[in-house]
Design a protein with these regions (language model features):
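Core register positions within helices of long alpha-helical scaffolds
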Residues: 49-52, 81-84, 112-115, 199-202, ...
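Short inter-helical turns and helix N-cap capping residues of alpha-solenoid HEAT/ARM repeat scaffolds
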Residues: 38-39, 70-71, 101-102, 132-133, ...
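Amphipathic alpha-helical scaffolding segments comprising HEAT/armadillo-like alpha-solenoid repeats
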Residues: 21-34, 54-68, 87-99, 118-131, ...
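Boundary at the C-terminal end of the N-terminal hydrophobic targeting segment
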Residues: 14-20
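Residue-level detector of extended alpha-helical repeat arrays and alpha-solenoid scaffolds
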Residues: 43, 75, 106, 137-138, ...
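Sec-dependent N-terminal signal peptides
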Residues: 3-12
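Acidic, serine/threonine- and proline-enriched intrinsically disordered linkers and terminal tails
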Residues: 134-184
Length: 281
């Protein structure tokens, strides 16, 4: 029996021995082939898989050229993967993506930049929500601004941003508002502007209050609902009385959030949510 085991072991070693270096080379070849796959689903899968490697393993060398892919879903996957690294070395590529001609890619890049605490991210999102001013950064032309505002946000891109709701530390008995955010974003006619406002709802940017105040009377119901949500969760108690007219809003989703926000703000002076530090969520 012992001899048989030794023979079997020898056979296994003879036919199954593979050097680690050879396996690594094979893996790199597989990723390279996937990155250049003729099928966009294959390239998208490669971009997603690259979120599992490290930057020092040439991830950026793979991902950089993919930002020029002709398929939008591939470019969005690249931006998402760049965000997974949470590393400042990805910033040049993310800022390139911020200038993509397709609004969905721009928004995905802005979201990641905001999470990395890069000022260009929050500025871009504020401009999506607010009105064009002389101080606007010029990130996009009037045509792109119009396209961004007309965009109905793909739920899969933004549905989870309420989880960052928005940087609140747990407070017993105080709701995060996650369900409220998801409800707004999952509506088929919810806009990218509403998603952008929810995303920056925890920002300490000094212009956010003005943006929220203006959004309370926006023509799009999802933006009004998002503004009410941010008034409650940020919070902005100074807008409490401005909520009263929205109790008669023509959209039920706005009315019920307004009622809840008004009640919540009644005790906001007594219970203030503790905020986390500057860590990325």
């Amino acid at each position: 029996m012992r001899i048989l085991i030794l023979m079997m072991l020898g056979t296994t070693l003879a036919f199954g021995e593979t050097k680690p270096a050879d396996t690594v080379e094979r893996c790199q070849s597989m990723l390279t082939e996937a990155v250049h796959d003729r099928n966009p689903d294959g390239r998208k899968g490669a971009a997603e898989a690259l979120s599992l490697v490290r930057l020092k393993d040439n991830a950026l060398e793979f991902l950089g050229p993919m930002l020029d892919d002709h398929d939008v879903e591939v470019r969005i996957a690249v931006v998402t993967t760049l965000g997974d690294f949470r590393d400042s070395r990805t910033l040049p590529l993310l800022k390139k993506a911020l200038k993509d001609p397709v609004p969905e890619v721009d928004l995905a890049a802005a979201k990641v930049l905001y999470q990395l605490h890069d000022p260009e991210g929050v500025q871009f999102l504020l401009e999506v929500v607010g009105k064009e001013t002389k101080a606007s950064s010029g990130y996009f032309t009037n045509e792109k601004r119009g396209a961004l505002r007309m965009l109905h946000t793909p739920t899969k891109l933004f549905i989870y941003i309420g989880i960052q709701a928005a940087g609140l530390a747990p407070v017993p008995g105080l709701g995060f508002g996650l369900s409220s955010a998801q409800g707004i974003l999952s509506a088929p006619d919810s806009s990218a502007r509403a998603a952008s406002l929810l995303l920056i709802g925890s920002s300490r940017d000094p212009t956010l209050a003005d943006t929220v105040g203006t959004a309370l009377s926006d023509k799009e119901w999802s933006v009004r609902a998002a503004a009410v949500h941010v008034v409650a969760t940020h919070p902005f108690p100074q807008f409490r009385e401005q909520l009263v007219p929205l109790l008669d809003d023509k959209k039920g989703a706005v009315r019920v959030r307004t009622a809840a926000a008004y009640i919540r703000l009644q005790s906001s002076a007594k219970v203030q949510p503790a905020r986390q530090g500057a860590g990325i969520h």
